Every structure is written in C-alpha cells, then in structure tokens.
Amino acid sequence: MTTGARPKEEYVAEPQLLPAWVNPDLDRLMGVHKERDGSYFRSWAESKVDLPAGAVFARINGITPTSQQDYATVQSGPNTHFVWNSDLYYCNHSCAPSLECDTSTWEMRVSRDRPLKKGDVLSVFYPSTEWTMDREFECWCGAGEGKCCGIIKGARDMNDRCLQRFWLNDHIHALRKQRANIPHL
C-alpha cells in the first residue's frame, strides 16, 4: 500500500544563504557598526556577502510610508517618502556608492559600476532618491577629487555635471525634466 508520504530525509535541508527576496534576513547580508567618541556618534553598515554588479542586494519592505520629509526619510516618489524599519537605515551616503536604492522596483541593488565584496561599506548616493533634503551636508565619503560632489543637497539643488555621473530614480528624472520645461522668471 502506498501512503504518499515522503521519506524523512527529503524534509531535511542544509542551511544556506538565501537571497533577500526569498528570505529577507538582513543579518545574513549586512552588519551594522556603531561608535561613540565623546559627543560624536557614527554608524555604518558593511556587506557580509560578495555579489556581482547590478545584483539585487535586498528587497525594500517593512517600511512606513509618510508624506513628511525629514533627515531620516527616503523619497520614493514626487510627494511620497518612507521611513526604514530595518538596518538598511544604516546605509550612508557616498559619491562612490556600493548600492542603488530603486524605489520603482523596491530593490536595493549592487551598484552597476562595480561588484560588492564582503566587508565593503554599504552606501547610496542620497540625491538619487531625494529631490530636496531636510539638511544639506558636507560630504566626507572619501571618493576623491573629481568624484566627490562636496556639499550634498537634494537633486534639485545639485550641479548637473555631478548628477550625470550617477544612477537616479525615475521620480528624480521626472522632476528634473519637469523643472527643465518650466520657463525661468
């Protein structure tokens, strides 16, 4: 008589690193570091995995949508923002970013320019999502002369020569096109 039951060994699976879109376990993909030096506090994220250029690093999920912009939100459309509810919050700005935050596909992807290596700092180019920013800041990314944009602002207020070097979200392209079509007074 056949019972249809599978042998026990078919239920045993070896642990493996699952892609983020299958099992969004960021602890397997990234580590967060925090340091305090007197009154100065800094934090950053590092990769725990090697991935090729353009690969999906993680899906963007578990976020809180908001219409209010502040220093901790990410712009996801012309009038929409969200708050991270994950360690992806610790991906800082760089003018040589290791990741791209794509709000049209809800993916964090490895930069198209280079692969991601274990130990790399996880970073994004903030103006790739932000049209305006709550707070502009002096960049300390260390990308080097001719690569670092200097003062980081929203894409609206950044130099076009600087922005042309970076991957930008669809809503940033649309807002730039809209601004270009408005006659200047």
Give a label for each model feature:
Residues 95, 99-185:
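C-terminal SET catalytic tail plus cysteine-rich post-SET Zn-binding segment of SAM-dependent SET-domain
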